[in-house]
Regions:
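C-terminal hydrophobic helical "lid"/dimerization subdomain
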Residues: 3, 7, 12-14, 292-342
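N-terminal Rossmann-like NAD(P) cofactor-binding module of classical short-chain dehydrogenase/reductase
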Residues: 99, 229-232, 254
């Protein structure tokens, strides 16, 4: 892809650092590279990236078998926050702090693991008052997805007095934010995880912990004992099957992920005999109006207060490749944010 004309692009240095993933046969080379500004796409908004974050999808984007990356070479990073240095449309002011996530960022369009980015205007969300760029990436796609899940459940009728709520994959990015969001809104939250050191979830507000085995066991029964008023499920697979089979009459499961697989092993019985709803949560193509609304909520009444002190790790751009390897190996937990540049 070619960049803007030199006259238009002087706001970006001739060269800058970026993590570039290049497919070579069945291998993906991941290296911190000095990039040329002409490598950036032709998009209206130039951003000096200050912060990004690590997501499971980023790890898949640099995996030979991930089936996520749609171009090579690619700067991965499905989240970014930083400062506008130029907007060719004139809608944004230089110096304005913005965030970008979803759409094709870090998948079919160079993403957040570089010191500079160019993105379409209609992907950009001005960071609401009350949040800084670092705060936005502490939440990132994971926090946004957690908020979409909680709001989706409440819009489907969930309320704290209806009973306990299950959060699956609770030590992951979506899960840990969902635990705190639900707990601070008055819900009794039970957190499920396969990680051995998960007591910090109790400090986020979880009422109790469940093992992954308890919430992902296969079953031939179409229905099980009604236990949950609702569930936030970023895992998928047999976990979704368990959640739906054990959700109470009229409850809902908000499904946003597939780390546990795509076969959920369900019959129609929970839906037609208990009125259970399975809500699809998509953070990638969320319309911009809804996106802005959710970020306003995350800056105000939905803002988590304890995630940073309990579950956030900060790394440099030079350590991103190693962090992605850890995620692929199943070693990641909590939120990892990336400080880009100075």
């Amino acid at each position: 892809m070619t960049g803007m004309t030199p006259e238009a692009d002087v706001v970006i240095p001739d060269t800058f650092l970026g993590l570039v993933a290049t497919q070579r046969g069945h291998e993906v080379d991941r290296s911190l590279t000095e990039m040329d500004r002409e490598q950036l796409p032709d998009s209206e908004v130039a951003i000096r990236v200050q912060w990004s974050s690590i997501n499971y999808k980023d790890a898949l984007a640099v995996s030979p078998d991930g089936k996520v990356a749609q171009m090579s070479p690619l700067v991965p990073g499905i989240d970014l926050a930083g400062e506008v240095v130029e907007d060719l449309s004139g809608n944004l002011e230089p110096g304005e702090t913005v965030l970008v996530h979803g759409y094709g960022l870090g998948v079919s369009h160079h993403g957040g693991f570089a010191e500079y980015a160019r993105v379409p205007l209609d992907w950009v969300v001005p960071i609401p008052s009350g949040l800084q760029a670092r705060d936005a990436m502490m939440l990132g796609t994971a926090g946004f997805t957690a908020a979409l899940s909680v709001l989706g459940l409440e819009e489907a009728g969930l309320a704290p007095d209806q009973g306990p709520v299950l959060v699956a994959g609770a030590t992951g990015g979506v899960g840990c934010v969902a635990v705190e969001l639900l707990a601070q809104r008055g819900y009794e939250v039970w957190a499920s995880t396969g990680k051995p050191d998960a007591e910090w979830l109790l400090d986020l507000g979880a009422a109790g912990l469940l093992t992954r085995e308890e919430t992902s066991r296969p079953s031939t029964r179409p229905l099980e004992r009604q236990r949950w008023a609702g569930c936030v499920d970023p895992v998928g697979g047999s976990t979704t099957g368990y959640a739906v089979r054990t959700t109470r009459y009229g409850g809902a499961v908000a499904l946003s992920g597939l780390t546990g697989g795509t076969d959920v092993g369900l019959t129609v019985h929970p839906f037609i005999l208990r009125g259970v709803s399975l809500l699809g949560i998509d953070s990638v193509q969320t319309p911009i109006g809804r996106r802005q609304e959710v970020w306003r909520r995350l800056a105000t009444d939905l803002r988590p207060r304890r995630i940073e002190e309990l579950g956030v790790r900060e790394i440099a751009l030079s350590h991103v490749a190693g962090a992605l390897e850890s995620v692929l190996a199943g070693l990641g937990s909590g939120r990892t944010i990336v400080k880009i540049g100075q």
